[in-house]
Amino acid sequence: MIFDTDTQLPIAHEEAPDILHDLLLLRKMEMEYPGVLQDIQERDINAARDRLREYRNIVLSPVSSDEARDRAIESGKSLMGALEDVVFIRVKKIIQIACDSHESGHVDPGAILPRETELLDAINAAIEGYLTREGFTPTKEGMRLSMSSVATVTT
């Protein structure tokens, strides 16, 4: 059963969005037009996870036919591949946002999902710690190498 993440009500399978098609399309568009995945909604990722749980239930159910299991396995593999690609593309974008913000000051991250904020904060802290150890100091324009600290940095 798939649930609408906004209303928490069940959605009939035939009425559920084709999340695999949506993710594959997003992935293709991202390759052609970088930045498209900035617009992905958390409900899209949640819908993909809900659909994967549904496929898993079909595969594990003792009453499922072999044909239904085979279809669920194939669909699940495709959906997992698309979801993996989407998540890793998002991680790369978050890393790029963090690097840009340290290089040039504040950068508007665009549409960051709530679950991605923690990752962005952790990456920002790690980058700042590393740059500080390398002799950089924070300025309004981002982290800049300090001449006074260059002499004290050991390699």
Question: Where do the model's predicted regions map?
Answer:
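Charge/polar-rich, low-complexity and marginally structured segments
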Residues: 2-150
